[in-house]
């Protein structure tokens, strides 16, 4: 295999495109967004933590971007990295996977490999990918190959993509071998599991584990706050135990595309088998509860100065769901911004990764990032720290903010000017 296609050039697809290019493949990046394709072909990065230099180096081996799905027929392997969101009712929304397969179907050819990397419920590959291929009169494992290999991308993380073990499940043994031959050229370790469903469930378990523990620690935080105890100090103390404890730190709520979404793919599928995933549903409830709790905390701190929300001036520090990246998908900061604005408050934000307010399917505001100075900080009744970006000047923030709600444990709380959130 010399030429591969990657469908979906976002936070997962772009790093993969770069990595395959670095390892001698000609990589074709498919995306319906023509602005992304244009930026790619100009060698311009559109994701903050990925340098343009990496894209330009990839182009030197002939890698490029396109929106023309007919080019599928020219590649040896197809890797699907499209979004898999949930509906308002927390049910799987697989429209992007279905659309990709419909568009690709006429251009599939004998000998190709398809790998689905998008996180989804167990059975998706067998229900949505394989039937489309078989409709083209291919035999899986003989003249066409299918695997599921979940993405494990951590935007802005310290561990390089190629150093993260690649999980892979094949529709047949021949499919698994074909998948290993592809991914083994890029990833240092490829772990073949016994079935596609095992691979699909592996990613769900990883994210369920984090979701449930974050739900637990945020509930713990809300109770500790009632007791007048600093949760951050409790977690730090517990983390000194060298066994049997993994530290999870509270925050303003779940964020990102994975944790607020993926666990509900599992709970939805569980109902098909007459089971209720109660821990997962409760963790989701805790995520909403902690956001509501933070709203109450804001009202409480404003009330200390006799200020109503409708006449308040509030600055939110950080729109990203995690530190040091330009990723605001499912960020609790966006929901909080909307709540303050909807209730008449004057709300602004500061985030070095978002000069302009990021538009999303749920929220869109015309706003730009506030430059942090002594003068700008003094204008606000309350500053709420939501994302622990390394580029924030924390001494400046502490010195010139009238009151701070800190959801990330940066400042020592004093219940006068600094409050835990």
Language model features: what each stretch is:
Residues 1-421:
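Structural/interface elements that position substrates and couple domains in central-metabolism enzymes
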């Amino acid at each position: 295999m010399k030429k591969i296609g990657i469908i979906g050039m976002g936070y997962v697809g772009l790093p993969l495109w770069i990595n395959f290019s670095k390892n001698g493949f000609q990589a074709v990046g498919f995306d319906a967004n023509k602005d992304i394709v244009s930026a790619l072909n100009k060698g311009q990065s559109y994701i903050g933590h990925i340098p343009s230099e990496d894209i330009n180096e990839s182009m030197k081996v002939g890698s490029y971007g396109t929106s023309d799905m007919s080019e599928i027929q020219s590649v040896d392997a197809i890797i699907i990295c499209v979004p898999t969101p949930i509906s308002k009712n927390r049910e799987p929304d697989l429209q992007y996977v279905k659309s990709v397969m419909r568009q690709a179907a006429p251009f599939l050819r004998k000998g190709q490999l398809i790998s689905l990397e998008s996180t989804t419920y167990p059975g998706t590959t067998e229900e949505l990918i394989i039937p489309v291929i078989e409709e083209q009169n291919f035999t899986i494992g003989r003249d066409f190959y299918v695997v599921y290999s979940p993405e494990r991308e951590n935007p802005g993380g310290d561990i390089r993509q190629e150093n993260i073990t690649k999980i892979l499940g094949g529709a047949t043994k021949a499919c698994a071998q074909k998948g290993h031959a592809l991914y083994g050229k890029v990833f240092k370790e490829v772990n073949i599991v016994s079935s596609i469903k095992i691979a699909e469930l592996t990613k769900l378990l990883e994210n369920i584990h984090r979701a449930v523990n974050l739900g637990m620690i945020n509930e713990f935080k809300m109770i500790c706050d009632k007791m007048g105890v600093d949760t951050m100090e409790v977690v730090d103390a517990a983390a000194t135990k060298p066994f049997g404890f993994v530290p999870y730190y509270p925050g303003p709520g779940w964020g990102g595309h994975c944790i607020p979404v993926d666990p509900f793919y599992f709970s939805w599928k569980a109902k098909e088998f007459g089971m209720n995933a109660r821990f997962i549903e409760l963790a989701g409830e805790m995520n909403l509860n902690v956001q509501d709790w933070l709203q109450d905390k804001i009202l409480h701190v404003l009330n200390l100065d006799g200020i109503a929300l409708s006449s308040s001036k509030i600055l939110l520090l950080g729109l990203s769901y995690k530190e040091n990246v330009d990723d605001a998908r499912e960020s609790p900061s966006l929901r909080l911004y909307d709540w303050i604005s909807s209730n008449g408050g004057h709300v602004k934000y500061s985030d070095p990764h978002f000069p302009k307010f990021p538009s999303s399917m749920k929220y869109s505001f015309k706003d730009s990032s506030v430059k942090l100075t002594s003068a700008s900080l003094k204008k606000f009744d309350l500053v709420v720290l939501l994302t622990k970006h390394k580029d924030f000047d924390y001494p400046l923030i502490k010195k010139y903010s009238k009151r701070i709600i800190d959801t990330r444990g940066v400042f020592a709380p004093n219940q006068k000017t600094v409050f835990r959130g």
